[in-house]
Structures are given as structure tokens and as C-alpha cells.
Amino acid sequence: MEKYHKTDIAPVEQENERDETYQASNPQIDFTRTRNNYNIIKRQRSYTQFINDKIEALDLPTKVRKDAVLMCSFVVGSDREFFGRLSPSEQQQFFVDCTRFFAERYGEENIISAVVHMDETTPHLHLNLIPIADGRLCAKTLFDRKELQNLQSDFHSAVGEKWSLQRGKEGSTAKHLDTAAFKLKKMNEAADQAELRADEAESRRAIAEQRQVHAERKTKQLEDRQKQLQQNTAPLQAAA
């Protein structure tokens, strides 16, 4: 889980929604597949405007601090093997189940967005919400260490068991990764894939070179044979 302040929100929206101003610094994004991304929850306002409207509706007794956490973000995904077992419709249902879990736990009205990225190494869900409880902003208490541990356990019970996901060790990051670790994992996977593609390209290049050498050798043999035939037929033509 990642916490964001006011100035962080617009860049997160650009990355999540892949808007026209987004300049990718993430090498694993394949923009030819960006059209396959989809929203499970999408508001008709920007992230910032949605948050501002929600805070205004709270009618808080004091002004929101400049360093207040206004958005908490989760990245939910799994590995290639898991998604390889699912059909496209099953993949979509998995992310719907994930979104429903967060909506029931923290209130659908507090979810800013839920968008699935299909244009990276593996599909994954970005879910952003406003940390509101008891009518106030409270990221610190809403997502303390105990709650995050409970969240991991409850998510597995509600979603993981249904989809046969392995339960990670409590408190570990083996299966429950925060945003930065998840991105790092995906970048490493992308690097491995890029290296594999480079090896395949090098192999194809070597095969092409071998074929070229073979073709040149055959051409030379044919030219030599033709030259020999011409030399052999020259005396016959002269005698005629």
C-alpha cells in the first residue's frame, strides 16, 4: 500500500489512466496494448476533484493539513502462471472480485478509481481510495500495521482461496507486495523478457547469416559449374 499527498495525485492519475500527457518512464509498458486497459470503477471527475469534493462533503471542523495523506493506493496482481490458467473473462472476474473486496471493506463511495493494466508484463489492478473512516481523513489509523496484516489475511480468505492463490507468510512481502516492490518485480520480469527477446534475435541473426553463407556458397558452385560447362562446350562450338 502506498500513501500519497496532494502534489502526488495528478502524476499517479496520469500513470494509472494513461492519459495523453503521460510520458512513460516504465520500460515494461507496451503502448500497442494500452487500448486493452479497462476501468472497473471510473469517476466522471479527475482524481483531485473527486477527492476535493469528498473532503468538502465531510465538513471537517479544521482545515486539511498540507501534508495530509489524501489517497492510498493498492496494486493487486499475480504471476504469469496464475494468469496463464485464466481465460480473459476469468481474469476480468478476478479483478472485479478484488475491487468488490476493497469496496465492501472501505466503502465504494471512497474508491477514487480501479483500473486494470493489460499493457505490462502481467495484468494487475491499480485501486486508489480516500482513507476515510468515522467521517474524517485517517490514513495513519485506518492503515496501521495491524490493519495491513488483517487486510492480507482477509483478502486471501475472500479472494485468494476462491482463485487458488497461495497465502504468503504473514507480514512478508513474498505474495503481498507494496507498489514499489511490485513495480520492481515487474521491471525485473520485463528485463528478463527483453534479454530473452535479444537472445532470440541474436539466434535468428546467426541463422540468417548461416543461410546467407550457404546461399553464397551454392551460388559460387553454380557459377563455377556454368563456367566449366562453357569451357567444355567452347571447342565443340569452334569445330562446328
Where are these regions (language model features)?
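N-terminal nicking endonuclease/strand-transfer module with a His-rich metal-binding environment
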Residues: M1-A240
